[in-house]
Amino acid sequence: MAAALSLRAPFSLRAVAPPAPRVALAPAALSLAAAKQVRGARLRAQATYKVKLVTPEGEVELEVPDDVYILDQAEEEGIDLPYSCRAGSCSSCAGKLVSGEIDQSDQSFLDDDQMEAGWVLTCHAYPKSDIVIETHKEEELTA
């Protein structure tokens, strides 16, 4: 029995199952991927967002899944961003959110006022929409 699934937002599908033969991921429109598992599949829709990083060297865009920290994805793609603790408890990776929404509930350094003002720690920030972040902002945050 075959089933069809149609998504109209920036989603990708992941197959989650016990080890079993898998069919390779196939690219689809808008950089989406669909995975098909032969047996025992449980599929979970995962949003992927466009993240524009404005660095002192220029702008770079990447796609970041909603369950991956922005710093981790940037490193995966060879983008050099500042960091120190990677625990959300310092300001080395501080940036300023220009547009969009993020979830940084895992961090412990920024207070509510700083987060409302747009400050972000890229080491503990998940995208929740397409976003623009100015990076390398530790000095401005701590001034």
Curated annotation (Swiss-Prot):
NCBIfam families documented for this protein: fdx_plant
Function: Ferredoxins are iron-sulfur proteins that transfer electrons in a wide variety of metabolic reactions.
Gene3D superfamilies the UniProt entry points to: 3.10.20.30
One of the Pfam families matching this protein, by short name: Fer2
Quaternary structure and partners: Forms a complex with heterodimeric ferredoxin-thioredoxin reductase (FTR) and thioredoxin.
Location in or out of the cell: Plastid, Chloroplast
Single GO cellular component term: chloroplast stroma
Main location: plastid
Keywords: 2Fe-2S, Chloroplast, Electron transport, Iron, Iron-sulfur, Metal-binding, Plastid, Transit peptide, Transport
Residues bound to [2Fe-2S] cluster: C85, C90, C93, C123
Family, as annotated: Belongs to the 2Fe2S plant-type ferredoxin family.
Transmembrane segments: none
Cofactor-binding details, from the entry: Binds 1 [2Fe-2S] cluster.
GO biological processes: electron transport chain
Residue ranges occupied by any 2Fe-2S ferredoxin-type domain in the UniProt entry: 49-139
Segment annotated as transit peptide: 1-46
Official protein name in the record: Ferredoxin, chloroplastic
Cofactor names: [2Fe-2S] cluster
Gene Ontology MF annotations: 2 iron, 2 sulfur cluster binding; electron transfer activity; metal ion binding
Gene: PETF
Organism of origin: Triticum aestivum
Matches recorded under CDD domains: fer2 (cd00207)
